[in-house]
């Protein structure tokens, strides 16, 4: 049996935004930020919509980047939240290069990446293979 996944919540994202972007954080829509925090936990018919840790991380990253809950800093917060989510679940993308991060986050912001593609990139950045 695998370890339970530890999720970030809305308060975690607000705290990260405050640290990253200043106090008060530039929140445009708190509901959209809450939605982004909740998305990795989504279930459909009693099953996880995002069954792997990587797909959960991908859902978080895509939602924070694309929901535009902040006036500014959505991409930066998305990456930070994803890196923290993975760290608290015993994975790491700390070895990812700035170019890898930039390319992935911009592909998401440009609506060019699926959850599966994002999850794959995150897993490759971690050095893990499933």
Label each region the model flagged.
Residues 1-130:
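FIC/Doc superfamily catalytic core
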């Amino acid at each position: 049996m695998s370890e339970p996944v530890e999720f970030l919540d809305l308060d975690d994202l607000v705290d990260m935004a405050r640290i990253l972007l200043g106090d008060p954080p530039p929140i445009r829509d708190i509901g959209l930020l809450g939605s982004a925090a909740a998305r990795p936990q989504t279930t459909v018919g009693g099953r996880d919509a995002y069954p792997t840790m990587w797909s959960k991380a991908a859902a978080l990253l895509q939602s924070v980047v694309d929901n535009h809950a902040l006036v500014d800093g959505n991409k930066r917060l998305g990456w930070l939240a994803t890196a923290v989510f993975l760290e608290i679940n015993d994975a790491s993308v700390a070895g990812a290069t700035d170019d890898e991060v930039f390319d992935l986050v911009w592909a998401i912001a440009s609506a060019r990446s699926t959850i599966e593609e994002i999850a794959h990139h995150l897993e490759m950045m971690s050095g893990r293979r499933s």
